[in-house]
């Protein structure tokens, strides 16, 4: 069975139906746009037919949104399907993953029989990525996965740094995960999606379910040069994106009011949560850039696994980060939720750490 991710609370045997407040999964606390519910009901009978195998309308609309033609877009059953598709189609001998990060990068390389080089970023440098030419000394490295902003640390790599790497290593395919970029202030300083059409070794992958609040529907997309798209489409499963997910994504992307409201809320609320966590003795939160906060525990009395269990006893779930490569039981991650829910979390944490 799949392990090592947040968001399993609804299906947990021990805590089912106990009203757990889930801070373990980083999903928009506003949920989905109201129009998504409406459009799904209106189009529910679409399940009587096969979905559009090419996601034609959705690819065209996504292309318009990100400034790319539709033949440079692939839509998948969540971004994770696309992470597995990329190495399966391009067949790298070796791939680099900068750790700690999303575990499915390494799993995708493993499933394609590529050798994995885990470059663990330094704790004393706050796990920040800095470009080093030595990363690419091994000439068998043909693929690099980089999460921006990184999950779970929240670290951002500037656009110029990424593009410099891509240009200097034209024989390496760089896969940039921008799943949380919609939560970032001034995303144009970090996103490289506009450059995918002119750079034959750059792929940008994005999720449509985290920001728009419907992870149960599973939908994401990638943007890449048309030559790469042709190669990847040879290996992509047909009909992987259902009809309701396609119409939900179209509707969500059109909801400018929801997008604006969600971003403004997140910019304010994550700062509130960061400041409150900073006041708790024994915690050192990292400055958040997306919809989650990465926290270091500075006391030996409450490792992350124990903290997780104690919080579950109070009806709250967090993401224990001890199973991330490069981390230990001094780290956890929490999603940014509503003010009322965040207050409950902070109050419970203070109670637990002062006992």
Per-region residue spans from a language model:
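Conserved PLP-binding catalytic core of the aspartate aminotransferase-like
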Residues: 266-267, 280-314
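Active-site phosphate-binding strand-loop segment of PLP-dependent enzymes
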Residues: 123-184
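PLP-dependent aminotransferase class I/II
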Residues: 32-33, 54, 201-279, 283-286
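PLP-dependent enzyme catalytic core of the Aspartate aminotransferase-like
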Residues: 160, 313-314, 325-355
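Short loop-beta-helix segment that forms the pyridoxal 5′-phosphate
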Residues: 51, 63-85
């Amino acid at each position: 069975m799949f392990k090592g991710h947040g968001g399993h609370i609804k299906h947990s045997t021990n805590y089912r139906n106990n009203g757990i407040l889930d801070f373990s999964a980083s999903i928009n606390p506003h949920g989905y746009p109201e129009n998504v519910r409406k459009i799904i009901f209106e189009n529910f009978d679409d399940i009587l037919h096969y979905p559009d195998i090419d996601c034609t309308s959705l690819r065209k609309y996504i292309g318009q949104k990100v400034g790319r033609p539709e033949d440079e877009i692939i839509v998948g059953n969540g971004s994770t399907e696309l992470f597995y598709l990329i190495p399966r189609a391009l067949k790298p001998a070796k791939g680099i993953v900068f750790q700690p990060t999303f575990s499915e990068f390494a799993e995708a390389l493993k499933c394609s029989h590529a050798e994995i080089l885990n470059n663990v970023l330094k704790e004393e440098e706050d796990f920040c990525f800095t470009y080093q030419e030595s990363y690419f000394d091994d000439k068998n490295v043909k693929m690099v996965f980089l999460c921006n902003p990184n999950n779970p640390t929240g670290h951002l790599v500037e656009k110029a740094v990424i593009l410099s790497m891509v240009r200097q290593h034209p024989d390496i395919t760089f896969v940039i995960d921008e799943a949380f970029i919609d939560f970032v202030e001034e995303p144009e300083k970090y996103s490289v999606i506009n450059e995918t059409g002119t750079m034959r070794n750059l792929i940008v992958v994005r999720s449509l379910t985290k920001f728009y609040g419907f992870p149960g529907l599973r939908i994401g997309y990638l943007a890449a040069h048309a030559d790469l798209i042709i190669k990847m489409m040879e290996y992509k499963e047909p009909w992987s994106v259902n009809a309701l997910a396609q119409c939900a994504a179209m509707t969500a992307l059109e909801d400018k009011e929801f997008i604006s409201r969600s971003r403004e809320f997140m910019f304010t609320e994550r700062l509130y949560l960061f400041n409150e966590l900073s006041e708790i003795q024994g915690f050192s939160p990292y400055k958040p850039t997306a919809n989650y906060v990465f926290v270091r525990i500075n006391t030996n009395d409450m490792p992350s696994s124990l903290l997780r269990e104690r919080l579950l006893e109070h009806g709250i779930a967090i993401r224990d980060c001890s199973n991330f490569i490069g981390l230990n039981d001094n780290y956890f991650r929490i999603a940014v939720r509503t003010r009322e829910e965040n207050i409950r979390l902070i109050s419970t944490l203070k109670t637990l750490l002062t006992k």
